[in-house]
Each structure stands twice: as structure tokens, then as C-alpha cells.
Amino acid sequence: MVDLVHTKREEILRLARRHGVTGVRVFGSMARGDAGPQSDVDLLIEVGAEPSAWFPGGLVAELEELLGRRVQVVTERGLDDLLRDRVLAEAIPL
């Protein structure tokens, strides 16, 4: 996992919990270790029974501010069928 996500792990998880997220996994270039300076951060999330009123927009905005990069979040249910197996195989729990 790229240092950016690793060093900010606790803050990412804190923000996620505040928005009702119960699990966070990193996938894509950050998980593979081939992220470049312009790479975004792809997060596979599990949402609890009571997400915040500002979910998911508030979570994404706060994570982008924290990480200084574009952030995309998706749930397993929201994964495209063509990408599902690859994403699940490379996803690394935070």
C-alpha cells in the first residue's frame, strides 16, 4: 500500500467511522503500489446501518482534503460486474 494511505490510515478510519462506515479497503493503483503523483485513491467501503446525513459526499470531501488527492468510494454492491473479481482480489483492508 502506498505510503500516503498507510501514514494517514488512522485519520482515514476515523473519518470513515464518523460517517457510518464500518470497513475500508484500498484497491486500484494504491493497493498495487504503482500509484503516480496524479493517481486517485480508490476505497471499497462497508456502510453500517446508520450512515451520516452527509454520506457519501461529506466523507469524500473530507478524505480528499486529508489526502490531497481525488478519492472514489464504492460499496461491494456498487461494483461493476466486470470489475468485481479484480477489485475484490486486490483490495487491502486498512
What are these model-derived regions, one by one?
Residues M1-G23, A31-P37, G48-L94:
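Catalytic core of pol beta-like nucleotidyltransferases
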Residues V26:
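Conserved histidines in hydrophobic membrane contexts and catalytic metal-binding motifs
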Residues P37-Q38, L43:
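A short, structured beta-strand/loop element
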